[in-house]
C-alpha cells in the first residue's frame, strides 16, 4: 500500500517542498530510504522503528520503501522523522492518511517524543506559500513557525508523535499557536549604555556616524582605551529591526541551530565577536552541511573583529565580498548557497605588536619596521572598504573622575533616528530600491544625493589629487559627508561636512 506525507527541507536560506512517500509490500522485512538522503536521514529509519514500537504501534513485518521526492536534491537532517513515521503507519493501514493540505516537521526520540529541528522558519514560510493549511511541529519550534502563519496556515505544537496521531484521529485536538506581537524596541534596554564610556569624544562621534549612516569603523588605540566598550554599545543606538529584517535574521539563526528554545523572531540586532583565530570557513560559512558563518550571523547587526591584524590574511580577505555586496556565496562540491551578510564592521587594533606605539607615557618596544609589518597585515583593499577610522588616545585622569556626564545611548539614539528618518524619506524616491542608509548608496546614487557647495567641491578636488584617492575612496568620503550633513539637517554638503569625513580616512592612519 502506498501513502505520501508532505514535509519540507532546506536549500541554503530557503525551504523546499518534500514528499515523503512510503510503500509497504511483500518481501523480506527491510527499510530502504532513497531520494539522496544524508547519513542523518538514513539513520532515521532506526529512530522511527524504535519510536513506533515504544508508542504502541506495530511495525510492518514487510519490505518498506521510502522515497524523499524530489530525488535530485540532497536531504539533510532529522526533520523527516515525523513524516516518515506517519507515512509508514499510513501505508500499513494503521492510521488514516492525513489531509493533503497538512504538513509535518520534527525529529523523533526513541520514546516517540518530538525534538526541535533547525531551519523551521524558512520551511514554515515555504509551507505557507505552498498552500499548507496545517503544520505540525515540535512544541519548542512552534513560536518560530508561528511567525509564518499569515491568514491561511495554522501551526500546531506537539510534544510527541502520539499527540499528532491522536489529533489527526480527532481524539485529542491540539490548539494552534498564535504569532506573538512584534516589538523590537525592548532590545534597547538590554544593550550597555554609552554613558559608561568616559572621554573619547571623537570615537563616540564616529560611532554615532556609523549608526546614522550604516558605516564601517576601525578603532586604533593602545590597550585600555575603550575600543571594545564602544563596539559593544553600537547595537544600542542602531534603529530597531524592521519585521523584514527580523525574519531574515531569524532564518539565518534558525538554519545555524542558534535559536533560543521557545523564541519567535530575533528582535535584537546581532553582535558577533569571533576570536582572531577564527578560520575563513567559520567567517564565510559552509562545511560538510551548509551553515551560515559569522558574516551571515551578524546580518542586520554588528560584526566586531578585535585585534584585526591577528586574523589570518585568508580570513580577512573573506570579508571583501560581503562588505561590498551585502551577501556571501559559499561553494562546495555538493553545491552552493548564498546567505545575506548586511552587517556593519567594527574593527579594533593596537597601533603595534606591543600596543604602545605613540603612547604619551609608555615606551614602545617595537622597531619601526616591526610596526610597519604589523600594520601591513591589514590589506589596502580592506581598508578601502572602511569608512571611519579613529585613533584613540588614553583616557585622562580628569575625564575618568570629572563631574560632567557623558551622553547616554538614549541621547545618541535620538540623533541617529533623526538622521535615519531623513534618509528614509530621501530613499523612498524611485531609483533607490533596496537603499535605506547612506552606506549602501551605489556610485551613481552618490552623484544624485551628494550635492555640494562650490567651496566643498573645490576642497574635494584638492583632497582627491593630493591624497591620491581611489574612486571607491572618493565615494566613501561622500557617503560619510552625507551622513554628517544629515545629522546636522543640511541639504548640501559644505566644507565642514567634507572636512569631518576626510579626517576619518583609514588609509593614512594605518599605513606609515
Give the ranges of each region predicted by the language model.
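Peripheral, non-AAA+ core regions of ATP-driven protein-machinery
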Residues: 1-218, 222, 228, 331, ...
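Hydrophobic residues in beta-strands of the RecA-like P-loop NTPase core, especially within AAA+ ATPase
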Residues: 105, 158, 284, 304-308
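Catalytic P-loop NTPase motifs of RecA-like helicase/translocase cores
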Residues: 111, 305-312, 355
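Walker B catalytic acidic pair
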Residues: 300, 306-307, 318
